[in-house]
Amino acid sequence: MLSFDKVSTYYGKIQALHDVSVEVKKGEIVTLIGANGAGKSTLLMTLCGSPQAASGSIRYEGEELVGLPSSTIMRKSIAVVPEGRRVFSRLTVEENLAMGGFFTDKDDYQVQMDKVLELFPRLKERYEQRAGTMSGGEQQMLAIGRALMSKPKLLLLDEPSLGLAPIIIQQIFEIIEQLRREGVTVFLVEQNANQALKLADRAYVLENGRIVMHDTGAALLTNPKVRDAYLGG
């Protein structure tokens, strides 16, 4: 469904990604783990077209994405939940969700809204509340709900557990698993390696802009090198 083939990305003269190859198959949850500054978010941003890959290929459902503007890429049934949530703080929950569904067909809009509110009952309770007055966990639910309003086939999640309480993190990961059961393919970028690897079908480890390991989530969870580096031994 999605493949990166020897992708390299630069910020000016600084190379952030070095010949990165990653594959996400339809119906999978694939996670990318790594330390701060490893290049995880850069890989997602490169997929979205900003920055553009300097070399290599990124294909989604057989179509080459490198060279396309971000506005075109994001109309291809791909949705992103950015790091830090980035909800529209002065808009209500309803208005935030409406922004996510801006390009959704009129016939599908209310169906999708109902699905999101069923998935996140808390958003239904806070429907008329301004997003900026909500807790971090509620804002993360809203950010995911907003992304789902576009009816994506592929959902990109950038550090969804960042800054959240453990009980909320567990809820978020349960929702990600539920989305997979409903047919959404998930590419998860996450520092919380323990949770991410438990959830993932397959996983990649990124260090200094390079893929250094790739295996099933279960295998990496028990890998001594991964445990020492990312799971506290």
Curated annotation (Swiss-Prot):
Q: Cite the InterPro entries for this sequence.
A: AAA+_ATPase, ABC_branched_ATPase_LivF/BraG, ABC_transporter-like_ATP-bd, ABC_transporter-like_CS, BCAA_Transport_ATP-bd_LivF, P-loop_NTPase
According to the UniProt record, one GO cellular component term is:
plasma membrane
Cellular compartment(s): Cell inner membrane
User: Which biological processes are named by the entry's GO terms?
Assistant: D-alanine transmembrane transport; L-alanine transport; L-amino acid transport
Q: What is its main location?
A: membrane
In this chain, ATP is annotated as bound at: 34-41
Is the Nucleotide-binding keyword given for this protein?
yes
Name a GO molecular-function annotation: ATP hydrolysis activity
Q: Which domain of life is it from?
A: Bacteria
The membrane topology term of the UniProt record is: Peripheral membrane protein
Domain ABC transporter stretches: 2-233
Keywords in UniProt for this one?
Amino-acid transport, ATP-binding, Cell inner membrane, Cell membrane, Membrane, Nucleotide-binding, Transport
Its family remark reads: Belongs to the ABC transporter superfamily.
What does the function comment of this entry state? Answer: Component of the high affinity leucine, isoleucine, valine, transport system (LIV-I), which is operative without Na(+) and is specific for alanine and threonine, in addition to branched-chain amino acids.
Q: What is this protein called?
A: High-affinity branched-chain amino acid transport ATP-binding protein BraG
Q: Which organism is it from?
A: Pseudomonas aeruginosa (strain ATCC 15692 / DSM 22644 / CIP 104116 / JCM 14847 / LMG 12228 / 1C / PRS 101 / PAO1)
The lineage is: Bacteria, Pseudomonadati, Pseudomonadota, Gammaproteobacteria, Pseudomonadales
